[in-house]
Amino acid sequence: MELLYADKRIAVAVKPPGILSTDEPGGMPELLRRQLGTPCIRTVHRLDAATGGVMVFARSAAAASILSGQVRDHQFRKTYLAVVRGDPGQSETWRDLLGRDPVRRRTVVAQEPGPDVRPAELDFERLASRDGL
């Protein structure tokens, strides 16, 4: 596991694609607990299992509370870099409704509002384009 930073409150590590963000067997918290030799690693934000990237983890209940509050209050910003095929446009904001598919146990785009549906917003900017990518 590539550890970018660690102190007594937080650990910052690179989550590889295919590894869960959550505290499941083989997930990032379990892997970091083993690597750091610490009993407490808590997830405060998530990346989809197929997504790789930098994640911040709390190393105590107090740090988890503070960081989770920052995520909830939108003081925590995630930035993604991606390579796509085709031309999505220069820059846009895409808005969708996200719900949970109980059969496949995954998040899906919902067609209409509902009790378990929440809005999602993605702002993107094309940084470069080459050979259809």
Per-segment meaning from a language model:
Residues 1-131:
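RNA pseudouridine synthases
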